[in-house]
Amino acid sequence: MWVMQGERRRARAPWGPPDTGGALLERWISRERRSDSRDASGSAKQRSAMGNSLPVESKFTDEKENDRIKYVVSSMQGWGEKMEDAHAAILNLDDTMTSFFGVYDGHGGAEVASYCAKRFHIELCNHEDYDSNLSNAMRSAFYSMDEDLQLSDAWRELVIPRNNGWMYFIKAGVCANLSPFPQATYTAPSYEGSTACVVVIRGDQLIVGHAGDSRCVLSRNGQASALSVDHKPDSESERERVQNAGGVAVGYSYRKIMGRWVTKKQWGFTDFKGRVSISRSIGDFACKKNERLPPEDQMLTCNPDILTMDITDDMEFLVIATEGLWCNMTNQNVVDHTHDRLLEGAEARVICEELVQFGLPSGDNTTVILVLFKPGAFPAVPPVDTDTDTDSHIDDDVDPTGSNNATASDNNDPANEVDPTANAGSDDSNTGDEVKVDATATAVGSSSTTAVAADEGTGNPPHGALVDTDDEDGLTYSQDMDLPPASTSPPTFPDEDDLPRSNPDKSPPHDDTYHRW
């Protein structure tokens, strides 16, 4: 029996509805094709027709401010096949002048990063140490995210809510009725994960926690200071942990071909699907299954580095961004561009979008949070006490953050400092203890050692050398050089008349043997 409907002929069985079997499938395909043809301006049609030949340069930008800080966040998919970055920016987290900012760079999918963006700050606020010990609460929040991902798939309902979030409860009821049948065992996301770089501003204190290669950079009077260190398998400490956990790391490098960065050789793990270029992340449980090791010693660990410091009025802004930005710009490049544009009077929204655009050649998604400290909202820098005799030898750059009270916590690497260019110590244990860093002196094993700045004109020890200031002769000897043992009497030097004079001006020749520092 044939029925005419419009200009299309279709077969209808006399015993059933008009759209059954193949006819229903054909109609659905035809409708999808018509909808695609009407969506001529949509990005989905563009990607289906062009693949990855064109980047997605549309940006999501948001900004808010209070009487102390202003923030702008912007994100762009770029050349990535899909958007796997996520972020959270909360100006008022509670009633105690607390702000929260976080960027999460996902890999293997966007679900873990999206879950972190929606849940991390909640886990932080719910911790018992949130009011008394914010550093400990932040560290526990990293581990809580991993635990939530391992327990069940309920976290996916928060990422992709279906039917107002009640799908999980409907599924639980249906599964209960099917209890006689064997139930599938939940498997944690093996190859899905995310980095995390979070910043909490409470009062005049700044707390930074990170795991992975997302980065936080501070601008102080136009100078860049890294508040986080990338966790890469090519670093000595991270490689040692990876190998001790049974993994094998290989190298990576990039090469620019036709304006795009292409991976030539990549650091990763031989048993990791697709390989990742980071050594710490949330998720990625395929590399966290060594039952003989604690979580902080796994091949991939979520154990974060924590930095605590005081905010002073010489701090201008923070830049918190995913790897897409840092692949193309150094810390100082980002600070210089932002600093110059602010002096030109450019809006913070425009500057943040420019930084995101700079991440386009990386071939990855890019997310940037720009946090501006308002002038006069934070205390001034306290003056340095110069009354003691040793103050002339103190290196003002000992503190990696430049403040008078900074705390750095590193749980795995004694050389993994908060600022690679500073002489800051770090804790080499996994207990979460923090290392105090003072702007006027640094303890390095004894009370008689201080950090001395370089003075090439006078022949002083090199920058950062350790010197002993307690010798009875009043001299300072570098511990990095081969010197005779200390004597109780002052050293003797020959008279100038006893030295051989071979130069016309009758001046004594240079002799390192009698070099006084």
Swiss-Prot record:
SUPFAM superfamilies in the record: PP2C-like (SSF81606)
Presence of the UniProt keyword Acyltransferase in the record: no
Matches recorded under SMART domains: PP2Cc
Composition bias type Basic and acidic residues, residue spans: 28-39, 499-517
Entry's EC annotation: 3.1.3.16
Polar residues biased stretches: 402-414
Domain of life: Eukaryota
Keywords annotated in UniProt: Hydrolase, Magnesium, Manganese, Metal-binding, Protein phosphatase
Protein name: Probable protein phosphatase 2C 20
Organism: Oryza sativa subsp. japonica (Rice)
